[in-house]
Amino acid sequence: MKIKEILCELIACGRNRTQYILEYLTSLGLAVDVQEYLPGHKNIEFVTSNDKAKQDIIFFVHHDISLKTREGANDNTSSVAVLLALAKSIRGKAFPYNIRLVFTDNEELLGALSPSTTAEKLQQIMPHVGSFMYLSKFPDKKNIRHIIVMELSGIGDSIYVASQSGNVMTDVSLNKKLLDIAERNNFQSVQLKLPSTDMLSVKVFRVSGTVIGAIPYYQAQNYVMQGKMFPAVWQNIHSEKDNLFAIQEKALEMMKDFLLHILEEL
């Protein structure tokens, strides 16, 4: 099954994609953990364990979508589809680390925040956010080597690695490793600042992390050089323009291939 076909099936589920994610993973014979932290809100996790591994690499993708869109194809159904395809590719394989693929809920609450959001307001919001609740219950956070958040994986011919997400700085050392992996394996890549606050949960728990995704290379280059003009592909998120029509199979496959290289080389 092509990754875009997985994405189509996810979109057909409407706003609740949890059942599809569960059924897809269990159909592969994979053991899945479900964390229901509030009524109707679920994180879903698949772990490829290594008995000798002492550290964890975690991939976060949020499966909820903005209320302003019916499909949320790029933000963030594309990343969900890529991670499901990755799960199929790595089942039965052993890696130097425990690899945790985590599909989180209610992250769009953070996407709606403004820079002026008060600390008090954040304290009220965070217990509703899937990544925060997942990390709050993680048994031994010092064993987390890295967290890689995936956002906007469905459009573009290059990989972006975020130097900053909203007001949160990402891990400089991790970013360099990822950019080096991209260069060694002939992926076009660019480092840039993201306006969204996808790293907030990671920051709260003081864990190494960053954000990656796909982006048209020349749009990214113009954004990096000019600093103010958002890439056109970002202007369509949280709107009805964020739909299946714009999604590119090549971008989805590129992201999955990059993730496989990360698992082998990080």
What are these regions (language model features)?
Residues 221-266:
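His/Asp/Glu-rich mid-to-C-terminal helical/loop segments that flank catalytic regions of hydrolases
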Residues 48-49, 60-63, 103-107, 150-153, ...:
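Active-site-proximal beta-strand/loop segments in catalytic clefts of secreted hydrolases
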